Amino acid sequence: LQEPIAGQIRVFDQGMVGKEEDEATDVRRRWGVLFQGGALFSTLTVAENIQVPLREFYPEFSKDLLDEIARYKIFLSGLPPEAAHKYPSELSGGMRKRASLARALAMDPELLFLDEPTSGLDPIGAANFDNLTRDLKETLGLTVFLITHDLDTLYAICDRVAVLADQKVIAIGAIEELLAIDHPWINAYFSGPRGRAARRGHSDQNDKVRAEMQQRGRS
């Protein structure tokens, strides 16, 4: 939506700055976006929202095919089948997030952008959304690029983290690598009370998973 004033943006090894619109559109077909507020069209049902990008890029698709795709994306996002005919105003906050995710998955993207995916969700809903994102990443082979301030989300699903501070990227790496960096902002963020709590929770969860796997191995 905005042209950068400096630097380059490369996606799928293609420069996006100054790219011809037709060429840029071909690249955009390969990614999906979940906006922070959902950005669902209020006058369309969940199924119709999911079909919006499909109608734009594939006008030759029949109604039956569009409906079938919408049903499948609703299933992938963890929504009940009856959500297809509901309007955004009839959904809870967590369901709206999932409906927005279903739309982001409509084009079978290789790359999924998530903008603050757990904002506005209670701790249980946020954890469930993290688990869903991780499952989709592993099942569909997605590359997920997300913006978040949620430490639990970082620990739950992120392989690499880019830290933005002082109007620039100050570090990139796995969380364990970032913890070894002596920078005041990084120390305050990852080693403050919330950071320590998230790290303990992640460690406890890993211990639980290992114990369950060992138990299965003995049974």
Q: Can you name each region flagged by the protein language model?
A:
Residues 112-115:
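Catalytic Walker B motif of ABC-type/P-loop ATPase nucleotide-binding domains
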Residues 87-91, 95:
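Conserved ABC ATPase signature
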Residues 44-53:
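Short coil-to-helix segment of the ABC ATPase nucleotide-binding domain corresponding to the Q-loop/switch region
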Residues 154-156:
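A short, surface-exposed alpha-helical micro-motif characterized by mixed small hydrophobic
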